[in-house]
Amino acid sequence: MSKITALFKELKASGKKGLIPFITAGDPDPKLTVELMHALVRGGSSVIELGVPFSDPMADGPVIQRSSERALTQGVTLHSCLDMVKEFRKKDATTPVVLMGYANPVEQMGAERFATEAKAAGVDGVLIVDYPPEECVDFAARMRVAGIDPIFLLAPTSSHERIKEAAKIASGYIYYVSMRGVTGASHLNTQDVASIIPKIREETDIPIAVGFGINDAASAKAVSVSADAVVIGSRIIRLLEDAPPGQAVQSLETFIREIRDALDS
């Protein structure tokens, strides 16, 4: 059983929901990333999504695009992201870490080498935004052989066939994108989310995490009624952008604790 699967079993047994924050590796400062990851755990995060910066993040809105640009400007690569996970693992061997990014850096490294190095670094899952499930059977199998959960996106526009394909090859959790468009959007309709999630559950018993448009404790709580976990990304990146010098770590921990408290209430 994978670390992510075990975590969701524990959450379900205790009647809790998962909290999955996203940060971009290397933003605002590569030297700060591991410290931010530990702050996420202290605040009550269940899983950490660590974004691999990319020059053309097509699914991301301006907030995460800026974040990627800042990280790339500071020389962050897929290799340095893996080094950050390795450093994080020196103090935390239990919190699942998912690498989230785009196909190009992985393909440049090669899927076989990526799987080997990611596993050695302590990565538990991988979500490649521009890998549709129907084209990734071999990639998903290679990840599972390495002990890494392949995670896939579903959206309001996903066909029944795509839902079935994702259900067949995904493990860990499925990431349901709550709305059309890019990350950072704010028009979240929780009724739409609640109506679509049961259709996904008809095809799979894999936990469903919902992201896009979750900006605060209230929206996180509302989405968690139907989802197994909530994902927060752009709001966190904005918080880090706006944090006064030297206060990013504490600001992040405080914000995550507010979300955790809301989910547990």
Curated annotation (Swiss-Prot):
Q: Which reaction does it catalyse?
A: (1S,2R)-1-C-(indol-3-yl)glycerol 3-phosphate + L-serine = D-glyceraldehyde 3-phosphate + L-tryptophan + H2O
This chain's function reads:
The alpha subunit is responsible for the aldol cleavage of indoleglycerol phosphate to indole and glyceraldehyde 3-phosphate.
MF annotations from Gene Ontology: tryptophan synthase activity
Where does the secretion signal sit in this chain? Answer: none
CDD domains named in the record:
Tryptophan_synthase_alpha
Pathway participation: Amino-acid biosynthesis; L-tryptophan biosynthesis; L-tryptophan from chorismate: step 5/5
Alphabetically sorted, this entry's keywords are: Amino-acid biosynthesis, Aromatic amino acid biosynthesis, Lyase, Tryptophan biosynthesis
Annotated PROSITE patterns: TRP_SYNTHASE_ALPHA
The cross-references to PANTHER family, in alphabetical order and at most eight, read: TRYPTOPHAN SYNTHASE ALPHA CHAIN, CHLOROPLASTIC, TRYPTOPHAN SYNTHASE, ALPHA CHAIN
Q: Name one Pfam family in it.
A: Trp_syntA
- CC terms in the record's Gene Ontology section: cytosol
For this entry, the protein name equals Tryptophan synthase alpha chain
Active site at E49, D60
Q: What class of enzyme is it?
A: lyase
Looking at the record's lineage, which domain of life comes first?
Bacteria
The EC number(s) this enzyme carries: 4.2.1.20
Show the InterPro entries listed in the entry.
Aldolase_TIM, RibuloseP-bd_barrel, Trp_synthase_alpha_AS, Trp_synthase_suA
* Record family assignment: Belongs to the TrpA family.
**What is its quaternary makeup?**
Tetramer of two alpha and two beta chains.
